[in-house]
Amino acid sequence: MKQMMSLPLYSGSFAEYQGWEDLRAELNRLGCDGLEGVWGGEEFPPDLPAELVVGYHLTFYPDWLDLYRDDRPALIRKFGSLDTARRFYGGLGPETLLEQYRQDLDRAAALGAKYVVFHVSDVSLEEGYTYQWLHSSAEVIDAAVEVINTILTGRDWPFAFLVENQWWPGFTFTDPEETARLLDGIRCPDKGILLDTGHLMNANTALRTQEEGAAYINAMLDLHGSLAAAVRGVHLHQSLSGAYVGSNTGFLPQNLPEDYMERFGESYSHILRIDQHRPWSSPGILPVLERIAPRWLTHEISSRGRRARAEAVENQIKLLRQGGLSGA
């Protein structure tokens, strides 16, 4: 099992370290084999050591299906105008989305990533509050399969292509038929699942303890039967936001800004309260990880700055070591 630390690949993150050797030393000290990176909107430094980046999280828009379908009335309803939508996405129509994915796949290949991660979900700002869905999971999965097959066609990519679960419409890892629909549709031999433990916990708002969360993850693995063998990677964190969701969803806040970007910023803090990305402290997750035996495990923990990030990752790795899951 290779263990990674999640880190945005941009100048602000890199500035927290005194060069690449300092970053490499930090990873070694923590017991990580490298990074799972995500593009930060900037060109990568030319001297970025490629061996540091083991995994690569592909770019994503939480709300992309109407862009891909070129459903302009829907975009106007959400953004207020097509001009605002164009500025947000960098263009309009399906090719805007596809080209951004192609460019990101090229970045991953150039870095020598061993795997890439692709979100399969769709949620608008309003849905994030109301929990009243505009699209079904089947719609999202079918469109995602179409996108994936389009961007992967015509080239032998040097990495595994892993789909990540969310708790919005799309791939949730709570319905084996939907999971099979997704995996069967992807025309890529080197494919699999990146199971996000916190996202799976978000799918069950009745959970109140880490132990309950671990049991629920185990139950979903049971439910999936032989499909569970498709899990090749894990995003390890925990999220117990059911009480918050119960009190703060089902309706739109009265004073949401009219400007889309202001509304986006305000809703982002709401989503962070749902998707908490906290480190595990309960050993209840250890038998689950032993059962999965992932090839890649990323410590994807919310933190502010280098010190907090290192402390959170270190604590979670200590927990794994207690269970004899120290890595490769």
Q: What is the role of each PLM region?
A:
Residues D83-P94, A138, E266-H277:
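A short acidic, glycine-rich active-site loop
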Residues L65-I76, H135, T249-L256:
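Aromatic- and acidic-residue-enriched segments that line the glycan-binding/catalytic groove
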Residues G90-G192:
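Active-site acidic/histidine proton-transfer and metal-coordination neighborhood
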Residues M1-Q3, L98, R102-Q103, G112-K114, ...:
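Histidine-acidic metal/acid-base catalytic patches
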Residues M1-Q103, G323-A328:
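N-terminal pre-domain/capping segments
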